[in-house]
Swiss-Prot record:
Pathway: Protein modification; protein glycosylation. It comes from Spodoptera frugiperda. Keywords: Calcium, Disulfide bond, Glycoprotein, Glycosidase, Golgi apparatus, Hydrolase, Membrane, Metal-binding, Signal-anchor, Transmembrane, Transmembrane helix. One of its GO terms (molecular function) is mannosyl-oligosaccharide 1,2-alpha-mannosidase activity. Involved in the maturation of Asn-linked oligosaccharides. Converts Man(9)GlcNAc(2) to Man(5)GlcNAc(2) primarily through the Man(7)GlcNAc(2) isomer C processing intermediate. This is Mannosyl-oligosaccharide alpha-1,2-mannosidase IA.
Length: 670
């Protein structure tokens, strides 16, 4: 029948043209298409089940949720960058950009941002987290290792390693309802006004933490006005989470358990210092990271913190490879290369190499690795044996030759915390480190004789020396820690120097308060001078800044604990009110460019030490004396509390190594 059906053929200029369309594929083409689709399906399914997020989860639903959490942690800026505010882009003004409404934010963007924030809060509110005092096992998985530590990761304090046999918690007696050590800042029935002040500081911590989490999570610090990460901080752009590590023990002490847990989990999963390929300050990394991690280990017993502290300590060891054992200032954890600051020439800084002793000694005691103690003991020996001009220590020393640089001496910048750590090393050792105490008292007698000055109106201050002479009649804000230092020294002596130390402590703390009281913002400048024209006031523009510093509040806290004079609490509350009025912004807390302006401009940096130190000391001053008692705890220069050996069973010293010897030590022995 087909033979009689008509056929049709197209012709162009009489030439037949073949048809270019078919209604079906040839059999071979069908097989090829099916094969491609089948291969694609197999690859897709394989990828689905071998992604790290899916391998570490028990169910597909959990895996999807984990992926969602990863996106969430990236922060709202990933999905919706914040709008330009105040006609600014970054640090540079932009002319002619119009914004709607107050503050320069587009109302549509504000509505979208509020919806996103509400969604994040709703999702975070769904979490049910255990109190960290009872269980600090990680709640997130990591592709780098097991998702949970062994059951015995939480260690009870080894009372046998300490002279004291009593139950001691961060707040004093061990809570009856728990076999862990729980922090309680105020006893039941406390004064409602004091409780209100304590809660105010806690809310400040939450405001600082929440905005860091929202705009800079995992980065080092926050720009609270720009609402983005601060990439030019002391730790640069590397994702070390400096604010997280620095603020963790403050969260714990304030009882902010959910926030502590999320910070703890970030450290467990993301803090890998050996991946950082940039120069880090040995000093800053030690006091903030090693110090912060060891403090959390002492408070909680979570061995993750101890192990991370050892990891960071190991990364710093190559900086000590010098002819004298005095470390270089900077270390690249990835390449292991170390160097000095360009501005310091061949020299290391006294306050940096001399402010490692607490952290490295304690790290040796809790890990059983003696190498850390060996490094700082070598520094101590060099500084003890070297010739000291007038019994004081110049700020610069060459680690290759062991010779002093410029004969510039200070209890402020470049020198301050070296002297602080001589006293605190003796305190933390339970009085066993006699060398440190002798070095401290000898240096302080020289400092009081040569640096202590009194202004025409009677204000005491610590000036700076160069070649034995006063070079400037000024005092740094950094020196304001000295009031607390001299007070601690006074209460631990039983001789004629004790009374003099306490007298100096009161006078210096009063002077630092005057530098606050004489500014329009009631916050203190970076440095202040003394002359007939003006006293306790800054004169140069770069001295008029306030960087959210804690040193004055540290002295308020210690002076309150040791004297019980109400004015120290009153001064602290004045500072809280000033911080809330001038430094608080929608995106956190900012430093100030000029403390003498009634409406000062912000510097747009929320320093990590604002959470670690400033807020911690302001919180502690309104707490009970049994909350971190000073006869059982000593604070490192970043306000991380360390237990005192022989007086606090949370010291957790071990008799033998609990971690393998670091590779650097093995290589040096070879």
């Amino acid at each position: 029948m087909t033979g009689i059906l008509p056929t049709y053929q197209r012709f162009v200029n009489g030439v037949p043209v073949p048809s270019i369309s078919r209604r079906s594929f040839r059999l071979r083409e069908k097989y090829l298409i099916v094969s491609v689709l089948l291969t694609f399906g197999i690859v897709w399914l394989g990828a689905l089940f071998y992604l790290p997020e899916f391998k570490s989860s028990n169910s597909v639903n959990d895996s999807v949720y984990n992926v969602y959490k990863r996106i969430q942690k990236a922060g709202p800026e990933l999905l919706m960058p914040p709008p330009l505010a105040q006609n600014d882009v970054g640090d540079f003004p932009v002319i002619g950009i119009a914004h709607h409404g107050e503050g320069g934010d587009d109302p549509h963007v504000i509505e979208d941002r509020n919806r996103l924030r509400a969604k994040i809060e709703e999702d975070m509110g769904m979490k049910v987290l255990e109190r960290p005092q009872f269980d600090v096992a990680p709640s997130v998985s990591s592709s780098r290792g097991p998702s949970k530590p062994p059951v015995d990761a939480i260690e009870e304090p080894a009372v046998g390693n300490n002279a004291a046999n009593k139950d001691v918690s961060p707040s004093g007696p061990k809570a009856e309802s728990s076999d862990k050590f729980v922090a309680v800042a105020l006893a039941p029935g406390a004064d409602p006004e004091i409780k209100h002040k304590l809660e105010t500081v806690k809310k400040m911590m939450l405001h600082a933490w929440y905005n860091y989490k929202l705009y800079a999570w995992g980065k080092n610090e926050l720009k609270p006005m720009s609402k983005r990460a601060h990439l030019s901080s002391v730790f640069g752009a590397g994702e070390l989470g400096a604010t997280i590590v620095d603020g963790l023990d403050t969260l714990y002490l304030m009882g902010l358990n959910d926030e502590f847990r999320e910070g703890r989990d970030w450290v467990a999963e993301h803090l890998h210092i050996n991946e950082i390929d940039s120069d880090l300050s040995v000093f800053e990394t030690t006091i903030r990271f090693v110090g912060g991690l060891l403090s959390c280990y002492a408070l909680t017993g979570d061995t993750m913190f101890r192990d991370k502290a050892a990891e960071v300590g190991d990364a710093l060891l190559p900086a000590f490879d010098t002819p004298t054992g005095l470390p270089y200032a900077l270390i690249n954890p990835s390449t292991k290369a170390s160097r000095q600051y360009h501005w310091a020439g061949p020299n290391s800084i006294l306050s940096e190499l001399g402010t490692l002793h607490l952290e490295f000694t304690y790290l040796s005691d809790v890990t059983g690795r003696d190498i850390y103690r060996q490094k700082v003991s070598r520094i101590r020996e060099v500084l003890d044996q070297i010739d000291k001009p007038g019994d004081l220590y110049p700020n610069f020393i060459n680690p290759r030759t062991g010779q002093w640089g410029q004969r510039h001496m200070s209890l402020g910048a470049l020198g301050d915390s070296f002297y602080e750590y001589l006293l605190k090393a003796w305190l933390m050792s339970g009085g066993a480190d006699e060398q440190a105490r002798i070095m401290f008292d000898t240096a302080m007698q020289a400092a009081l004789d040569k640096m202590l000055r009194v202004s025409p109106s009677g204000l005491a201050y610590l000036a700076e020396l160069k070649y034995g002479r006063i070079i400037e009649e000024k005092m740094d804000h950094l020196s304001c820690f000295a009031g607390g230092m001299f007070a601690l020294a006074s209460t631990t002596l039983d001789n004629s120097m004790s009374e003099r130390y306490m007298d100096v402590a009161k006078k210096l703390t009063n002077t630092c308060h005057e530098s606050y009281a004489r500014s329009e913002t009631k916050l203190g400048p970076e440095a202040f001078r003394f002359s007939n024209a003006a006293e306790a006031r800054a004169q140069k523009s770069n001295e008029k800044v306030y960087l959210l510093r804690p040193e004055t509040f540290e002295s308020y806290f210690i002076m309150w604990r040791l004297t019980k004079q109400q004015m120290y609490r009153d001064w602290a509350w004045e500072a809280v009110q000033a911080l809330e009025k001038h430094c608080r912004v929608e995106g956190g807390y900012t430093g100030l460019v000029n403390v003498y302006h009634a409406n000062p401009q912000g510097d747009d940096v929320q320093q990590s030490f604002f959470l670690a130190e400033t807020l911690k000391y302001l919180y502690l001053i309104f707490g009970d004396d049994s909350f971190l008692p000073l006869d059982e705890w000593v604070f490192n220069t970043e306000a991380h509390p360390f237990p005192i050996r022989g007086k606090n069973p949370l010291y957790r010293a071990v008799d033998k190594p609990v971690l393998p010897e670091p590779a650097h030590a093995q290589n040096n022995r070879i």
